[in-house]
Regions:
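Flexible, glycine/charged-enriched surface loops at secondary-structure junctions
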Residues: 57-65, 164-167, 230-237, 267-278, ...
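C-terminal binding/interaction regions
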Residues: 117, 121-122, 135-165, 170-172, ...
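Gly-rich Lys/Arg/Thr-decorated short loops/hinges at beta-loop-alpha junctions or inter-strand turns
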Residues: 23-35, 109-115, 189-208, 286-307, ...
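Glycine- and Gly-Pro-enriched alpha-helical subdomains that act as flexible
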Residues: 72-111, 242-342
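Alpha-helix N-cap/helix-initiation motif
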Residues: 36, 40, 214, 247, ...
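Conserved helix-loop functional segments at active or binding sites
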Residues: 53, 227, 264-268, 353, ...
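Active-site loops and adjacent core secondary-structure elements that bind or stabilize anionic groups
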Residues: 1-199, 214-232
């Protein structure tokens, strides 16, 4: 099939709509089930590139959770400890396959943003991963294949209408890509940058010690940024993005947004949150919403009389600002990547508050010296990649 007709484009008034191969060749993707839309395909193809490159860079199965053409989360398939399994709501599923662990991590980092995601998987979808996907609110999935059992499980989702795409893992796009804006055609070479350890050789700080685990996290941050709408900043820990700040016009706002998401990820692991007693039958999405409000500044909205009873068996104690700060002070060895240089040291100060130890960024600011000095103050390790990673 060389084209697929779509119901509409970005919005219902944008008709007609289709995806097609300009040279008339076969599309590298098959719709196995459902009727994916324009934005679904944008998420699927961007997400597939991301997980394909994560797998190539780390040798581990990878997954990403996309919303509106940026990742809400991305991860490789490292095992989950008991705490992560609980905050990702998968502690009832037993031991998971590496691919399922990757998606649990990708979905779990920012569950509020991942609601209604489009999923990309680097490997053939197995039954463990399908079972995890089935219970989440999601628009669709793309993978290089599906086991018979996994496909059967996914076909039970959305009353049989769940979008299931199969991508040809051997497909190689043309080296030039085009798009139109206002009837004008833009052409550029594809961003085929190979994110490897060599990009991280130029360490500009006094501390130059990067353990292997941090090296993997730095590569993950750069690959995630490569497929995130700019400006973007990405915090990573233990093989998964824990905070992604996408599409901001100011670098510091990217760093703050991503940092606040990383903070929320860590606060969800605190004893106060882990000990919340939810009412029986409360769904995962409602639990996520309650936690998000509880750990935020508007906590009174979920603790008010007549409200807390809808979510909790026992009224939670207030999670004070001081208690939250004390818990966040225990977050360490976090990596942060930036798709362009940090123009001021305020980005480093903000990153430090979220436990950042390792930084990967292009460098090239007239204030690089001040940024490096701030990193040295906190004994951070920073590598200048010399490569910008804008994505639009």
């Amino acid at each position: 099939m060389s084209e697929i007709q779509l119901k509409y484009g970005c919005n219902p008034n944008q008709k007609p709509s289709r995806i097609y191969m300009e040279d008339g060749s076969e599309l590298p993707v098959k719709v196995l089930n459902g009727r994916p839309g324009y934005i679904n395909f944008l998420d699927a193809f961007n997400g597939w590139q991301l997980v394909k490159e994560l797998k190539e860079a780390t040798g581990l199965p990878a997954a990403t959770s996309f919303k509106h053409v940026s990742p809400a989360g991305a991860a490789v398939g490292l095992p989950l400890d008991d705490t992560l399994a609980k905050i990702y709501w998968v502690d009832d599923l037993g031991e998971l396959s590496p691919l399922a662990c990757a998606y649990a991590r990708a979905r779990g980092a920012d569950r509020m943003s991942s609601f209604g995601d489009f999923i990309s998987l680097s490997d053939v979808c197995d039954a463990d991963t399908a079972r995890l996907i089935k219970r989440e609110v999601s628009d669709g999935v793309i993978a290089p294949g599906y086991t018979e059992e996994a496909f059967k499980i996914l076909m039970e989702k959305k009353k049989g209408a769940y979008n299931i795409l199969e991508i040809d893992p051997n497909y190689q796009p043309a080296p030039l890509e085009k798009k139109q804006v206002y009837g004008i055609t833009f052409e550029q070479g594809r961003n085929e940058l190979d994110v490897n350890a060599g990009l991280l050789d130029n360490i500009v700080t006094d501390n130059k010690e990067i353990p292997e685990s941090a090296l993997i996290d730095m590569k993950i941050s750069l690959i995630v940024l490569k497929y995130t709408q700019s400006n973007s900043v990405c915090y990573v820990k233990n093989g998964q993005a824990i905070g992604i700040g996408a599409g901001q016009q100011s670098r510091i706002h990217c760093t703050r947004l991503a940092g606040s998401k990383a903070d929320n990820w860590f606060l969800r692991q605190s004893p106060k949150v882990m000990g919340l007693q939810f009412v029986d039958g409360l769904g995962r999405a409602d639990r996520d919403n309650a936690i998000d409000v509880y750990i935020g500044d508007e906590y009174e909205d979920v603790l008010a009389e007549g409200v807390w009873q809808k979510n909790f068996k026992v009224k939670p104690e207030v999670f004070t600002r001081e208690e939250k700060r004390a818990w966040l002070n225990g977050m360490t060895d976090v990596t942060v990547g930036s798709d362009a240089f940090f123009p001021f040291s305020d980005n480093i100060e903000r990153a430090h508050k979220s436990g950042v130890k390792y930084i990967a960024q292009p460098g090239g600011s007239v204030r690089d010296d001040a940024v490096i000095e701030c990193c040295n103050k906190y004994n951070m390790v920073m590598a200048f990649t010399g490569i910008r990673l804008f994505h639009h």
